[in-house]
Each structure stands twice: as C-alpha cells, then as structure tokens.
C-alpha cells in the first residue's frame, strides 16, 4: 500500500559548524534584508562581505570556546528524528537552515527526491518576527517559486502560547528550581533575543508574544521573583530594553545573590546560550557579586517539546494554507 506522506520542514536559523564556516555564515546573515537593511539592495551583498570579514575573527573565537562550531544542526536534526518517530509513518522530517546548511533549497530538493509534495513548514522560533520566522518563510516562498514541483505548503508561524510549549518550559524551570534549598530566594531572568525597537514600532508582534509567554509561565510559579530582558544586541540603533547585561547589573545592585537564567526565545542550545549566557553573563554576574548563577536547560529534544511540535504539525490552530 502506498502511503500518502507529508514532509515536515523544520525552519531554523542555522549556525557555522566549523571555524572556517563562520565568515560565510555571517555573510549570509548580513545579506538578508529581512533582518537588516544596509544601503541599497544591490550593494548589500558587498557590504555584508565586508562586515563578515571584520567580525569573523571575534565571532570565530567564541565558537572555538564552545567546541569549534555551532551544535544547532545536530540538535535540530535530533529534533527532526524524534518528531518523525512521534508522528509516525505518514510523515518525513527535514531541516532547513536560513543562513547555513542544509539551506532551504537543499531541503526542498530532498523533499522532491522523497517524492513528497505536501509540506508543513514549521518555524522553530516560538515567537513570530519578520526578522526570524518571516525571513525563513520568505526564503521558502522564493525557493518554492523557482521549483518545478507544485508543492502544497501549510505554515506554522508561531507557537508562543501553545499549552505544550508552556508546559515544556515550565518543566525545565521546575527541574532547575528543584535544585535550590529555597526557591523563594531565586530570581528568574527570562532572556529573549533582542530586536531593534523600530521593528516593534512598525507592528511586529514579537514583544507582545514574548510577554505573553512569560505571563503564562509565571501563572505556574506564583511567588517567584521574575524579570525579562533582551540579549544579543548588535549595531548602533535602539534595541528592546532592558538589555540582559543591564538587568544583571541592576539585580546585582539590589543585592540579588541567586539568579536563574531562562532562555525564552531559543528552543535549542547555540552560541547565545552556550557562550553569551553560560560564559559571558556568568562571568559578569559573578564579578558583580551574584553568588549563584545558573541557566535552565534548553528544550532541545525534550519529549514534551517534541509532543508540542507534533501537535502543531497535525493541524493545530496556528496554520494556514499557501
């Protein structure tokens, strides 16, 4: 019997898997006009090349410190494998990275080779922004338009308030809090990837969705002190405030001694968790007098999180046909 299968396309940012890949990865990132507009469109690839060359040495050193490359591809492929097990034989899962390999065109070619034309494109960014999910879906549409295959695509654009996503976050936080003698002494610092304020001013829903996630999580942790901040700022423009560095300084100044970091916009470990939080922010916090600095484990292939993805794929309420 021939099984009518659906391809699940997991859309993720991607990351350089070697030191040599850092500069071309950065070049791809800074060439994307959905995330940053540098001069006229025809000049952006050249400017992106110059920026990537200038930044690559510093960024490469950060990747060297976490093992020589990003684990994001491996972790996303593990998520794809676990999701395929949960979904069963009617589904095949593929990975499409926005700025590295396998890129969207490679992923769609693999779908074609598998003989599948129906796709559920699932963004692994829980919170929608035109700079993240929006960019990935735009790239998918460009690649699809060039293909001779008549794909039928359903897009899952966000899941910031999905009950299983909230439960999976709460599970990780609960595990971390159980390691303290008195959780009431702990301050939770939810840290999300930053975004230029201009995106929010133009109607991007990212900030509202981040706040909604935090509010839903905190319904289950009444009495625990919590805060929200934004990391990974780049460039001279105004970004969402407060920055994570600023909030850590503020909390240290208030005498906070136990700080538990909760990465809220990342579903897998990568440079922002393994270096920025685990190394950079840890060092700054300890220098400022915070005595106990910890981070909640990332979702990665948490069974609860994989169940969330499976429910979304099977036709949750965040889908639309394109």
Curated annotation (Swiss-Prot):
So which domain of life are we looking at?
A: Bacteria
Major localisation? cytoplasm
Keyword field contains Nucleotide-binding: no
Q: Which GO terms describe its biological process?
A: heme biosynthetic process
Q: Which PROSITE patterns does the annotation name?
A: FERROCHELATASE (PS00534)
Provide a Gene Ontology MF annotation, just one: metal ion binding
Reactions catalysed, semicolon-separated, are:
heme b + 2 H(+) = protoporphyrin IX + Fe(2+)
Q: Which GO terms describe its cellular component?
A: cytoplasm
Q: List the disulfide bonds.
A: none
Q: In which pathway does it act?
A: Porphyrin-containing compound metabolism; protoheme biosynthesis; protoheme from protoporphyrin-IX: step 1/1
Q: Which SUPFAM superfamilies match?
A: Chelatase
UniProt KW keywords: Cytoplasm, Heme biosynthesis, Iron, Lyase, Metal-binding, Porphyrin biosynthesis
Using the UniProt record, name the top-level EC class of this enzyme in a single word. lyase
> Where does the chain bind Fe cation?
193, 272
EC number in record: 4.98.1.1
Give its localization.
Cytoplasm
Q: Which InterPro entries match?
A: Ferrochelatase (IPR001015), Ferrochelatase_AS (IPR019772), Ferrochelatase_C (IPR033644), Ferrochelatase_N (IPR033659)
Function, please? Answer: Catalyzes the ferrous insertion into protoporphyrin IX.
Recorded protein name is: Ferrochelatase
- Which species is listed as the source? Pelobacter propionicus (strain DSM 2379 / NBRC 103807 / OttBd1)
């Amino acid at each position: 019997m021939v099984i009518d299968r659906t391809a699940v396309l997991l859309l993720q940012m991607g990351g350089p898997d070697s030191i040599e890949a850092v500069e071309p990865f950065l070049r791809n990132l800074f060439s994307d006009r959905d995330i940053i507009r540098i001069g006229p469109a025809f000049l952006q690839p050249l400017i992106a090349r110059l920026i990537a060359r200038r930044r690559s040495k510093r960024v490469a050193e950060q990747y060297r410190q976490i093992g020589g490359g990003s684990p994001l591809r491996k972790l996303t492929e593990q998520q794809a494998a676990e999701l395929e097990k949960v979904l069963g034989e009617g589904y095949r899962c593929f990975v499409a990275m926005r700025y590295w390999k396998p890129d969207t065109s490679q992923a769609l070619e693999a779908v074609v080779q598998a003989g599948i034309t129906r796709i559920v494109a699932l963004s692994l960014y829980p919170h929608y922004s035109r700079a993240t999910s929006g960019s990935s879906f735009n790239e998918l549409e460009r690649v699809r338009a060039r293909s001779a295959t008549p794909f039928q695509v359903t897009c899952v654009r966000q899941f910031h308030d999905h009950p299983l996503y909230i439960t999976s976050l709460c599970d990780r936080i609960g595990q971390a809090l159980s390691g303290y003698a008195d959780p009431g002494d702990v301050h939770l610092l939810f840290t999300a990837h930053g975004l230029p304020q201009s995106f929010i001013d133009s109607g991007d829903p990212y900030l509202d969705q981040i706040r909604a996630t935090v509010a839903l999580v905190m319904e289950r942790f009444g009495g625990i002190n919590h805060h929200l901040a934004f990391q990974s700022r780049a460039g001279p423009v105004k970004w969402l405030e407060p920055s994570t560095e600023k909030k850590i300084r503020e909390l240290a100044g208030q005498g906070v001694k136990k700080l538990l970091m909760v990465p809220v916009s990342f579903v897998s470990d990568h440079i922002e968790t393994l270096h920025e939080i685990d190394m950079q922010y840890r060092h700054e916090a300890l220098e400022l007098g915070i005595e106990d600095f910890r981070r909640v484990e990332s979702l990665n292939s948490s069974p609860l999180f994989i169940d969330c993805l499976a429910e979304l794929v099977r036709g949750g309420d965040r889908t639309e046909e394109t």
